[in-house]
C-alpha cells in the first residue's frame, strides 16, 4: 500500500476546498468516505469493547466463533443482506464517494459475503479500508486487501 504524504497534514481541510465551498453555499456535499457496518456480530468477546456496553443493541452478540456462526444462521437480521450491501456500494460509487470503510459494531469479516463486498468496492473504483480483529480471513481476502488503502487490525482484540 502506498501512503499519501498529505494524510497527516494539518492543512488536510484545504485539500477539499470544493466541499467547504459547498457547505458555505448551504449545499450538501457528497461524503469523501462512507463507513459501512455490514454486521453487528463479533467472534470475540473483548471486555473493553464499546459495542458490548449496555444500551447497544449488539451487546449480546459477542462471543466464541461457534456461537457467532450459530447466531448468523439463526438471525440474518444481524447483518445487512448481500444484495442491499451491493446496492449501497453501487449508490456510493454513483454519487462519487471516494472511499468505503468496512468497520465495527461487530467484526466485518463475519459477514459471509465480505470477500465479495471488498472486491466489489474495488471494482467500483472506490478505495477500500477495513477495521478488523484479523481472525476471520477467508482464502483470497489478504490479496484483495493488499489492493486497499489501509487495514487497521485491533491487536488488543
Where are these regions (language model features)?
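N-terminal pre-core extensions flanking Radical SAM catalytic domains
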Residues: 1-73, 90-93
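Radical SAM/AdoMet-radical enzyme domain recognition
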Residues: 77-105, 110-157
Amino acid at each position: 500500500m502506498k501512503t499519501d504524504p498529505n494524510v497527516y497534514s494539518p492543512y488536510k481541510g484545504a485539500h477539499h476546498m470544493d466541499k467547504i465551498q459547498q457547505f458555505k453555499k448551504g449545499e450538501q456535499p457528497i461524503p469523501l468516505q462512507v463507513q459501512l457496518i455490514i454486521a453487528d456480530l463479533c467472534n470475540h468477546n473483548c471486555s473493553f469493547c464499546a459495542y458490548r456496553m449496555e444500551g447497544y443493541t449488539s451487546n449480546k452478540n459477542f462471543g466464541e466463533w461457534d456461537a457467532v456462526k450459530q447466531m448468523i444462521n439463526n438471525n440474518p437480521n444481524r447483518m445487512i443482506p448481500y444484495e442491499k450491501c451491493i446496492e449501497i456500494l453501487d449508490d456510493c460509487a454513483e454519487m462519487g464517494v471516494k472511499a468505503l470503510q468496512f468497520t465495527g459494531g461487530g467484526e466485518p469479516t463475519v459477514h459471509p459475503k465480505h470477500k465479495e463486498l471488498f472486491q466489489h468496492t474495488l471494482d467500483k473504483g472506490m478505495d477500500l479500508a477495513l477495521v478488523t480483529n484479523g481472525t476471520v480471513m477467508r482464502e483470497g481476502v489478504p490479496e484483495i486487501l493488499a489492493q486497499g488503502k489501509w487495514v487497521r487490525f485491533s491487536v488488543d482484540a
